[in-house]
Amino acid sequence: MTAETILLSLHLSAPELILAVGALVLLMVGVFSGERSGLVVTGLAIVLLLASGLWLLFVPAEGLAFGGVYMADGFSRFMKLVALIGSLVALFMTMGHARENQLDKFEFPVLLVLATLGILLMISANDLISLYLALELQSLALYVVAAINRDSLKSTEAGLKYFVLGALSSGMLLYGMSLVYGFTGHTHFTEIAQALSVEGARSLGLIFGLVFILAGIAFKISAVPFHMWTPDVYEGAPTPVTAFFAAAPKVAAMAMLTRIVITAFQPVLADWQQVVVFISIASMLLGSFAAIGQKNIKRLMAYSSIGHMGYALVGLAAGNQTGVSGVMLYMVIYMIMTLGTFAIIMSMRRKDGTVVEDVNDLAGLSATNPFMAVVLTALMFSLAGIPPLAGFFAKYFVFVAAIEAKLYALAIIGVLASVVGAYYYLRVIKLMWFDEATGEFARVSSALRLVFGLSGLFVTAYVLIGGPIGGAAELAAATLF
């Protein structure tokens, strides 16, 4: 590599370099800043994430870096901005609640920055090896974050369960990659696509490799049948950590899955489409039915998340440009709805400081905290896909893509699953507005109020402000085709 290509590579990967160098600086600051290290490092971590996002926004650069293993294009830029917003909001939400969740250690924001670095690299990965390394960087940070509350048995259990199942999924992914490399002789996505375009290149071993890769990535997005870790980890991990898990890593994994199937495996679309359709249907149905009996609101959100990943996969199964832009839009709307809901869950504490997570504790919320009740009602209606809220448009675009691809059965099952899924969202609304209050919540912090207030505003005003976001998603999706 010449000096010119090295400089070009560094320029293209500047958002990641900001986080990588910044994380090392944060470690030094944390060691030398005494008792207030947690707060200082969290503030600096937010500045780092902002700097990375602003670079992406105002210094658009496209091209291949580091010998073609890193791709900077419109798709990666869009998804990175979404993921950075998710990380930024999740970190901002922890600031007022760090001590009670054992998150006041300076290592926590550093781990979040390292996980976000892995997330950005995952989105730009253009090679099987760079994809795996980025995925592991993100995963290793998240394993520690899940178990960071050492005084909580549930948190420790969540971290251990996530680690064991995560290691299993990484092994499946790596085995799939080795099969694909063995049958094509390449690890670059574009070269894999060229090798698969040759007549007779599609062999049984290659299809096995593809299935293993899809299985490994399905674990990361909590898709059925690789969802087992999600309810336990969501319930056991500290709530600010769960909010992060539900946002940025899901965006990155979905972006990674989209890039690999559209760029590398487009010539064998008929093969991976069947697998994605199955995973999508299973996720939608399990997410809708399993959430009905849940009492813990974090477990309910875990099954809701599984269902939503199923809906997003409807767009990916279509395998067309409309589907990809639908997936991108779905992830934006899903992330904002989820972060808003978790901001409200973090606000569920009694005046004596007791944290409550039972759905029934929301009873009578409209009488004790009308603003929170109104926002949560809007978010629940949006998660259920009720028009004219943002969640309706998210589902509408992926179903339209499925119909364009003649996947009529998939679209019909998706609509029916939405109807079933609406039950548990409406149950929460009924509790808030029609049941007697069981007690008042403590005063909500201004940070959380800001997050859920803006989320509620977004889902209700999406019909007016959604045009530019949809247009940006379409332009970004076009770069993959």
From Swiss-Prot:
Biological process terms in GO annotation: ATP synthesis coupled electron transport
Keywords assigned by UniProt, alphabetized: Cell inner membrane, Cell membrane, Membrane, NAD, Quinone, Translocase, Transmembrane, Transmembrane helix, Transport, Ubiquinone
Protein source organism: Rhizobium etli (strain ATCC 51251 / DSM 11541 / JCM 21823 / NBRC 15573 / CFN 42)
Subunit structure: NDH-1 is composed of 14 different subunits. Subunits NuoA, H, J, K, L, M, N constitute the membrane sector of the complex.
UniProt key word Ion transport: no
Recorded catalytic activity of this chain's protein: a quinone + NADH + 5 H(+)(in) = a quinol + NAD(+) + 4 H(+)(out)
Lipid bilayer topology: Multi-pass membrane protein
Protein known as: NADH-quinone oxidoreductase subunit N
Protein family per UniProt: Belongs to the complex I subunit 2 family.
Subcellular location(s) of the protein: Cell inner membrane
Residues that span the membrane, as ranges: 12-32, 39-59, 78-98, 106-126, 128-148, 163-183, 204-224, 237-257, 272-292, 300-320, 326-346, 373-393, 407-429, 450-470
Principal place of residence: membrane
Its biological purpose: NDH-1 shuttles electrons from NADH, via FMN and iron-sulfur (Fe-S) centers, to quinones in the respiratory chain. The immediate electron acceptor for the enzyme in this species is believed to be ubiquinone. Couples the redox reaction to proton translocation (for every two electrons transferred, four hydrogen ions are translocated across the cytoplasmic membrane), and thus conserves the redox energy in a proton gradient.
InterPro entries: NADH-Q_OxRdtase_suN/2, ND/Mrp_TM
Gene: nuoN
Top EC category: translocase
Domain of life assignment: Bacteria
